[in-house]
Amino acid sequence: MKTISNSTLNENVLLPDYDRSTLKSRIVHLGFGAFHRAHQALFTNEMLSKTGSDWGICEINLFGGEDLIQSLRAQDHLYTVAEKGAESTEVKVIGSVTESLHPSLDSIQAVLEKMAEPQVAIVSMTITEKGYCADPATGTLDKNNPLVIADLANPTEPKSALGYIVQALKIRRERGLTPFTVMSCDNVQENGHVAKAAILEFAQLLDPELRDWIETNVTFPCTMVDRIVPAATEETLTEIAELLGCEDPCGIACEPFRQWVIEDNFVAGRPDWNVAGAEFVADVVPYEEMKLRMLNGSHSFLAYLGYLGGYAHISDTMTDEGYRKAAFDMMMQAQAPSLTMPEGTDLEGYAKLLIERFTNPSLKHKTWQIAMDGSQKIPQRMGGSLRFHLAQGSNFSWLATAIAGWMRYVSGVDEQGNDIDVRDPMAETLRQICDQHGLNVSVVPALLAVEAIFPVELGQNPQVIDAVSSAYQSLIDNGARATVAAL
């Protein structure tokens, strides 16, 4: 079978230009998904190209993804990333992966032994928010989670990422080895703190002494990651095969932009990812807030109002001058003033770059996809800036319009009377409220009263109720496109 490792590839493909045989698995990564392939593994590939160091990655999938691991092995752990710009595509073969494991292909013990090897200095992860087994209401470990229950009952045969990390650290401690750094790369606010809290709480239930050792000896740097990486489709893989010169079932496409901000807090050394464009900083939080409010907040605005306006993709909304202007104004007038950034941060430059990213037509990022899980996203993306404007007495009409757009969207019926497939953990609750009120402005205070989404000081604030009601009424009377154009 022809694969990347034994085929003559097209001449414009960028191949690893370093000696892969010298690499050691100094990083173990949990979660060989699309984002990691286009982000951390690619940064590592470029770092290796520039430094000639020996930081290789052992990839591990704990749940599903066996096919992906087998495909990766069949092609000597090489795979492709296609960076698709508006005008052209750059194809890179990534060589930073040294080996791979899967508990159901190898064994649980094989995974634990790999994590316990002396040269392993970092265990990184992209396991999604669910992987941290936290109770959404309290943020603490969900002791009723079936994985947590199973791992506490049988810690030497773990199932969860938490179980594997704690057991591997226990083995290292018993063998007198230095611990590794635990580095979350998930798109979760203060992800290092989330990982640390979950792991310490889990370890406390298992062995309080081990918990204390972990707290004293292990570091959990926070990271901020950014790159748009749509899920791979048959169309993507066909396109990659044509660009590459052979098939690659592990291939992934993404945008050219990438960002990685890392808290410089490592217990056993780290690669010089900064030579590949990563930034090492003392505090990641300001950068997270910048991304959450300016990128994610305007993304949500475009998702709800774009979908209602009949636009299938984010790039389609950017062909409408009203949406383009409103998104930029929202970033600069509603979100940027609410941020406290390190000196010299160019927020206007960042906003212009975001508009350029949103305009990229080759990504096909669906408004419907970004509109998912709004009840979880809106508080993070808009709550902080809403509080800022209420305190300052300044204009927050863009935020009010975004929230009204979400309310109109979760009614489950679009402007043509067609059903909307609303995907949200609270979809049922939201649907009941919307059904009670119909497309009537009385739905606004009813939805603002849902405290799991809007804390009382926001949801019961008369200015918020008035501004969102006014925007909602405009959506009913004039539709999304006219409402956005009038901002």
PLM region spans:
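Substrate/ligand-engaging "lid" and interaction regions
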Residues: M1-L487
